[in-house]
Amino acid sequence: MLQIKEQLKQLTPYQPGKPIEEVKKEFNLDRVVKLASNENPYGCSEAAKEALQIEVQQMALYPDGYSAALRTKLASHLGVNETNIILGNGTDEVIQIISRSLLDPASNTVMANPTFSQYKHNAVIEGAEVREVGLLENGCHDLDAMLKAIDEQTKVVWVCSPNNPTGTYESGRNLIRFLEKVPEHVLAVVDEAYYEYVTAEDYPETIPLLERFPNLMILRTFSKAYGLASLRVGYGIASEQLIQAIEPARQPFNTNRLGQAAALAALGDQAFIHDCVRKNNEGLKQYYDFCDEHGLNYYPSQTNFVLIDFKRDADELFSELLKKGYIVRSGNALGFPTFLRISVGTKEQNEGFLKTLAGML
């Protein structure tokens, strides 16, 4: 019998939100609205769509394995050198690269709980000990407790800010104080997948911190605000020395041709991003007002989703909404058994969803 790694037996494949077509078929619905996967309801930039029309003619050719054009544009946009960037098949792959490069059975890694599931998933595959630290009551990371969990065997500490699934963030003051205390032998990863949506004035600009903290790595993505989730383009920003050290763990041709072209074009259309952020803030207010009106607790969000406590079994409410044509994310698998995580849709989608929800409370 094949001897599969023992640690894989405690894992299950990542469970994304239900596909729209599957829900239509299952419940015989003509219209289904997906508010589960924190996708951009406004799609992507027209410039990205135009770039795809050109690039699709080259699908028989392998992509640029170094993503040179995108890397150059991205470096200019971020104000860093090209050698400070590693590109991946979504930030999921960059997380995998980090884990593959640093973690082993003799090491441990520290993270919040609940937070993005792929930090733990990849650490378990590498055989590392996972040290999880509960969130504070306000949904933020307990950074002091995370520091206490670090020891000589710790290789990576993960900070998801804004955090998924709470939408909460770490202030600049708190994050810098934390980074000052992280030992030099530990890589501090700050996952900023929702960076573009953040409006909090005390949210830190982390890229300038790279010079001060050579053991810092920042993760960002084109899947959220840029609306390119299906094309899988994410990236990490760190010191040149760190990027060079982990590059061998990257798969060849890992960022596909269409993704590179669309991301390159999308970077040039920041007006689209600003418009999406404005609409997202208006959408968040719709949810906040609804919660205040109905006495529901929620975590104020710096993302394009909101986590709401309905004081009832999340799976049951999820199933009821599914039958009515709304796909959301049950908090049961996210560590919040009475909460739903709801992606912010268009104004019309939000209105329809909240009207349906009001009739179920």
Swiss-Prot record:
State the family it belongs to.
Belongs to the class-II pyridoxal-phosphate-dependent aminotransferase family. Histidinol-phosphate aminotransferase subfamily.
Provide the E.C. number(s) assigned to this enzyme: 2.6.1.9
Upper lineage = Bacteria, Bacillati, Bacillota, Bacilli, Bacillales
Q: Name one GO biological process term.
A: L-histidine biosynthetic process
Please verify whether the record's keywords include Acetylation.
no
PROSITE patterns given for it? AA_TRANSFER_CLASS_2 (PS00599)
Annotated positions of the N6-(pyridoxal phosphate)lysine modification: K224
Cofactor field: pyridoxal 5'-phosphate
Q: Which PANTHER family match?
A: HISTIDINOL-PHOSPHATE AMINOTRANSFERASE, HISTIDINOL-PHOSPHATE AMINOTRANSFERASE 2
Catalyzes what? L-histidinol phosphate + 2-oxoglutarate = 3-(imidazol-4-yl)-2-oxopropyl phosphate + L-glutamate
Q: What class of enzyme is it?
A: transferase
Keywords for this protein = Amino-acid biosynthesis, Aminotransferase, Histidine biosynthesis, Pyridoxal phosphate, Transferase
What organism is recorded for this protein?
Bacillus licheniformis (strain ATCC 14580 / DSM 13 / JCM 2505 / CCUG 7422 / NBRC 12200 / NCIMB 9375 / NCTC 10341 / NRRL NRS-1264 / Gibson 46)
**A Pfam family that the UniProt record links to this protein:** Aminotran_1_2
Return the protein name.
Histidinol-phosphate aminotransferase
Check the record and name the InterPro entries matching this protein. Aminotrans_II_pyridoxalP_BS (IPR001917), Aminotransferase_I/II_large (IPR004839), HisP_aminotrans (IPR005861), HistidinolP_aminotransfase (IPR050106), PyrdxlP-dep_Trfase (IPR015424), PyrdxlP-dep_Trfase_major (IPR015421), PyrdxlP-dep_Trfase_small (IPR015422)
Fill in the subunit field for this protein. Homodimer.
Recorded hits in SUPFAM superfamilies, A to Z, give: PLP-dependent transferases
Q: Name the gene.
A: hisC
Q: From the UniProt record, give the pathway where this protein acts.
A: Amino-acid biosynthesis; L-histidine biosynthesis; L-histidine from 5-phospho-alpha-D-ribose 1-diphosphate: step 7/9
Gene3D superfamilies (UniProt xref)? Aspartate Aminotransferase, domain 1, Type I PLP-dependent aspartate aminotransferase-like (Major domain)
Q: What GO terms are given for molecular function?
A: histidinol-phosphate transaminase activity; pyridoxal phosphate binding
